[in-house]
Swiss-Prot record:
This is UDP-D-xylose:L-fucose alpha-1,3-D-xylosyltransferase 1. InterPro entries: Nucl-diP-sugar_transferase, Nucleotide-diphossugar_trans, UDP-D-xylose:L-fucose_XylT. Residues 1-34 are cytoplasmic. Residues 1-21 are annotated as: Disordered. Expressed in roots, rosette leaves, cauline leaves and stems. Glycosylated. A motif (DXD motif) lies at residues 190-192. One of its GO terms (biological process) is rhamnogalacturonan II biosynthetic process. It comes from Arabidopsis thaliana (Mouse-ear cress). The keyword Cytoplasm does not apply.
């Protein structure tokens, strides 16, 4: 009997430590497992906050993953490249481009309202010519502005016919060529334009380059879409304000030739020919006409300002057929704005919220 009790006690004590150890290990094991899961979950949430989603332009900065923690959130846009920006905004292989310096931000906003009404605003890429424009646009509309160095002086680029204005416009063919080399269709617009209809519906066929005539003389509604014959001075007057290009060898050749023509002539205050990029564009068109498939857009759909704002009878006769109106044939920032206001085309005052930029201060 005593032996049985001794064995029982021994058995009880010998099993107790292992049993106690087994039980005490369970909560520690469970706690470790749950803690690990919670740690992983917290890490995933933290990465979700710090890292942008793949479709965001911020995702395009692989070496700047901590940019959201940077004391200067604007600085990341200095590293934003044209290739990154084009990839971000392109829709159906197409980018809509404008080039803007900060004094013309109100005109950019006005143009954007009209583009938004045609549901094409997501394709827009603003090529900022100064850092004020780069930061302002990307603050309001992240990823839709890029600056291609060097930045220009906004004040000198403000006045039509100045050397600053010439330098501002002279970079245009280089920007467009870069986008073509990336494989995108590209539409260029000046921002002193207003869309009344969808211009993409009027890009008939599959030509290399589409453009508009800057002459105010009225053409027949069924006029030729070939490059007009030069006048007796050997000049054509195609506008460099609205151009559509496909990524073809012909379009690339045209941009290269345009750039060459600009580089071959220095700016001259006394010579109108050298005061902006349009004469060089016409030279390039005429020199490459036999190598590039060119298409002159309809005058009634894309009228120059010299016709639309100066021939009221024609405007009434062709009412409903206008697609993009260009506020040219007038010089001066305030005069352009007033003319838009007089014709009900200054949309910013009452419709700013229709722009992706909203109200600009």
């Amino acid at each position: 009997m005593e032996q049985k009790q001794h064995i029982l006690k021994q058995s009880t004590f010998s099993s107790s430590p292992s049993s106690y150890s087994s039980i005490s290990d369970r909560p520690i094991s469970l706690l470790s497992r749950n803690g690990l899961l919670l740690l992983l979950l917290a890490l995933v949430l933290l990465l979700g906050v710090l890292l942008p989603w793949p479709g965001s332009p911020l995702f395009l900065f692989p070496n700047r993953l901590s940019s959201s923690l940077s004391p200067s959130p604007q600085s990341k846009w200095r590293d934003y490249t044209l290739a990154q920006a084009a990839r971000f905004v392109a829709k159906n292989g197409t980018v809509i481009v404008c080039a803007v310096s900060s004094p013309f931000l109100p005109f950019l906003n006005n143009w954007l309202i009209s583009v938004s009404r045609q549901k094409h605003q997501d394709k827009v890429l603003v090529i900022a010519e100064d850092y004020i424009t780069l930061y302002k646009v990307n603050e309001k509309w992240p990823g839709h502005a890029v600056l291609i160095p060097p930045a220009l002086d906004s004040k000198t680029a403000f006045s039509f016919g100045s050397q600053g204005f010439f330098n501002f416009t002279a970079r245009r063919p280089q920007h467009l060529l870069q986008i073509l080399e990336l494989g995108y269709n590209v539409m260029y617009n000046d921002v002193d334009m207003v869309w009344l209809q969808d211009p993409f519906l009027y890009l008939e066929g599959s030509h290399d380059a589409y453009f508009t005539d800057d002459m105010p003389q009225i053409k027949p509604l069924n006029h030729s879409h070939d490059l007009p014959h030069p006048d007796r001075n050997g000049e054509t007057y195609i506008c460099s304000c609205m151009i559509y290009l496909r990524p073809t060898n012909g379009a690339k050749l045209l941009m290269k030739k345009w750039s060459e023509e600009l580089q071959s002539q220095a700016w001259s205050e006394s010579i109108r020919f050298k005061a902006n990029d349009q004469p060089a564009f016409n030279l390039a068109l005429n020199k490459t006409a036999h190598q590039v498939d060119l298409y002159l857009l309809s005058q009634v759909a894309f009228p120059t300002g010299g016709l639309y704002f100066k021939n009221e009878a024609w405007v009434q006769e062709t009412k409903g057929k206008h697609v993009i109106v260009h506020n040219n044939y007038i010089i001066g920032y305030d005069r352009k704005m007033k003319r838009f206001q007089d014709y009900g085309l200054w949309l910013v005052d009452d419709h700013a919220l229709e722009s992706p930029l909203g109200k600009l201060e």
